[in-house]
Amino acid sequence: MVAHARATPGHNGRVLHVILFQPEIPPNTGNAIRLCANAGASLHLIRPLGFELDHARLRRAGLDYHEFVDVMVHDGLDACLDALQRPRVFAFTSHATHRYTDTRFAEGDALLFGRETTGLPDIVLQSIPETRRLRLPMQPDNRSLNLSNAVAIAVYEAWRQLGFPGGT
């Protein structure tokens, strides 16, 4: 299921890259595997992970989609971005002021999501230009969306903007 970091923009027809920073909940990552398989995106996981990659709930959520997606595990965010040849990175956070729908995505972009419990660390957010820190609108008294739901919303918007390449 897991490959060594070797992806480049457009690698194996992958026009988008999803990066999960230190994910903690196996079903969310499993759902992201299935989503990336269906949208033709690659999935990058940044260590430490909150679970083992052979976790039963991860396999159940990803079903048999592992063969249709490039899943790569990296020791850190910099290693991941180096492997991807430093793509444009969009960080999704409830603290951003820019909406994801006001952004023009391009082939090879990387969509970065934080931990389920704490989001992205400030040091990571500060390394991303403010115009590339994006939020998904929600009701004012809510803290956040489920990670796999946020990934799905963002990936499908980016894929839509690109014209759903490879989709039917």
Q: How would you describe each model-predicted region?
A:
Residues M1-T168:
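Post-transcriptional modification and biogenesis factors for structured RNAs
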